[in-house]
């Protein structure tokens, strides 16, 4: 019966492989709980030779199956979906659930594949809060979000006709007289130049209005002066109005505290520098000078010790009439200096100790005994406890006969041996020698008899062998 070739269950040439990956965050179905969160991604077959040739262009010469070109692509570059030539794209209809691959005829539901249309921004980026200051927000809105907005303040409440009030033109306020006197010269020249230009070009205003009238552009320019609005702080040297958030009461309180703190470091508040030579005079009858002298005398008095306190008078118990009149008592004041404490080397080295240096006395430690290893076993010698006799050794000791024991002639002679012991020892040696001679003679005779017997056997064996030959 001919062998039939079995049809394979999967044809590799027509098969389609998929990767199970997570659904993209830009996919609209990512937020749908009923849709599966993992989708099938068709694999793209790439020729190994073409891939390796492409890798060699970029200096990658590894001969393996790993795709190193995926690390050379720009992660932020534009990506395009290119259909593979090995399989056809799934032909799915919006109304039909199953998708059909034309090359293989595989029918799979559309929910297992990614959506055809994707959003520009993913779900995670949409839900992520915006960190940092938002310049596009109104300061009042920022204050309200930060719970700094005072809803009870009547000024913060809007009127019913706030739109009409906002559109109503308002007259500009005039500048202060002090600022006009300080900064008016710079604007006077500009007024003259601009006035002359206006008169020369268009003449006076038809309605007889003045350039400096309230609401005019000139007045508005003077109102919003840069040096009038900007206020620099001591600790930043930057404008306080340049802050992103509006300064509420708490932030203003912090600013004032920092201002007070940095006022202490102004040039006027800083005192004399270190190591500065201070010169001056002091009166002779000054109380401060008297206190210094009293302290000096007290220190000297503490160092001085009277002789009477050191050596009491020996004859103080004698009556006064027994004392020699010729002898006169003389009081001598002896100044004794305190004995200086003598430090040893260890104490002196201890004064040099710090966080990293800890000096101490160097102790002499004897050199440890060298360990010798056994040449046979490699085990350290004289370390393990000595073992006793084994069972075999004990059995052999019990099997020893009297003949195996050492003879008297081989035993060492004692130095404290007496004449009787010497005589007995010599007699025992003679008997041992006599026994040895008898034993030796018997052994010789036994060897001779054995030799004769073996010679006879050899002779008979030779004769028998010769008789058997044909």
Curated annotation (Swiss-Prot):
Instruction: State the coiled-coil residue ranges.
Output: 414-470
Q: Where is the composition biased (Basic and acidic residues)?
A: 413-437
Write out the ranges of the annotated region (Disordered). Answer: 25-53, 162-222, 400-437
Biased segments, Acidic residues type:
178-196
Give Gene Ontology CC terms.
cytosol; nucleoplasm
Q: Which residues cross the membrane?
A: none
Recite the UniProt keywords alphabetically.
Coiled coil, Phosphoprotein, Ribosome biogenesis
In the record, biological process GO terms are: ribosomal small subunit biogenesis; ribosome biogenesis
Phosphoserine modification sites are 17, 24, 243, 326, 403
Q: Which family does the record claim for this protein? A: Belongs to the LTV1 family.
The role this protein plays is: Essential for ribosome biogenesis.
Q: What is this protein called?
A: Protein LTV1 homolog
Instruction: Please tell me the species this chain comes from.
Output: Mus musculus (Mouse)
């Amino acid at each position: 019966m001919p062998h039939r070739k079995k049809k394979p269950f999967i044809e590799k040439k027509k098969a389609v492989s998929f990767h199970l990956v997570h659904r993209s965050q830009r996919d609209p179905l990512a937020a749908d709980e009923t849709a599966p969160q993992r989708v099938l991604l068709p694999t793209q077959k790439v020729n190994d030779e073409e891939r390796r040739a492409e890798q060699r262009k970029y200096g990658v010469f590894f001969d393996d199956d790993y795709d190193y070109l995926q690390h050379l692509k720009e992660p932020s570059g534009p990506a395009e979906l290119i259909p593979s030539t090995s399989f056809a794209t799934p032909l799915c209809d919006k109304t039909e659930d199953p998708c059909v691959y034309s090359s293989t005829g595989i029918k799979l539901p559309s929910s297992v594949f990614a959506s055809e249309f994707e959003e520009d921004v993913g779900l995670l980026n949409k839900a992520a809060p915006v960190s940092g200051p938002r310049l596009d927000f109104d300061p009042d809105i920022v204050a309200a979000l930060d719970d700094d907005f005072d809803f009870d303040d009547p000024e913060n409440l809007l009127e019913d006709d706030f739109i009409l009030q906002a559109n109503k033109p308002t007259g500009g306020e005039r500048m202060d007289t002090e600022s006009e006197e300080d900064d008016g010269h710079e604007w006077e020249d500009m007024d003259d130049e601009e006035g002359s230009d206006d008169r020369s070009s268009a003449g006076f205003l038809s309605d007889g209005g003045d350039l400096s009238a309230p609401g005019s552009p000139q007045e508005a320019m003077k109102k919003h002066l840069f040096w009038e609005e900007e206020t620099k702080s001591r600790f930043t040297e930057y404008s306080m109005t340049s802050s992103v958030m509006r300064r509420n009461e708490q932030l203003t309180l912090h600013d004032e505290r920092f201002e007070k703190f940095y006022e202490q470091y102004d040039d006027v508040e800083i005192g004399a520098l270190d190591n500065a030579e201070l010169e001056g005079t002091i009166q002779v009858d000054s109380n401060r000078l008297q206190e210094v002298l009293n302290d000096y005398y007290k220190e000297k008095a503490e160092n001085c010790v009277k002789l009477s306190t050191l050596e009491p008078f020996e004859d103080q118990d004698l009556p006064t009439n027994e004392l020699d009149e010729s002898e006169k008592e003389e009081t001598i004041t002896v100044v004794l200096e305190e004995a200086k404490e003598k430090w040893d080397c260890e104490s002196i080295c201890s004064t040099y100790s710090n966080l990293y240096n800890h000096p101490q006395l160097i102790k002499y430690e004897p050199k440890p005994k060298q360990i010798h290893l056994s040449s046979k076993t490699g085990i350290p010698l004289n370390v393990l406890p000595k073992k006793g006799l084994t069972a075999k050794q004990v059995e052999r000791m019990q099997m020893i006969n009297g003949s195996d024991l050492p003879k008297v002639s081989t035993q060492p002679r004692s130095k404290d041996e007496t004449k009787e012991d010497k005589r007995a020892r010599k007699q025992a040696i003679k008997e041992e020698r006599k026994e040895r001679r008898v034993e030796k003679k018997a052994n010789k005779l036994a060897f001779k008899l054995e030799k004769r017997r073996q010679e006879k056997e050899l002779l008979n064996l030779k004769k028998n062998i010769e008789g058997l030959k044909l």
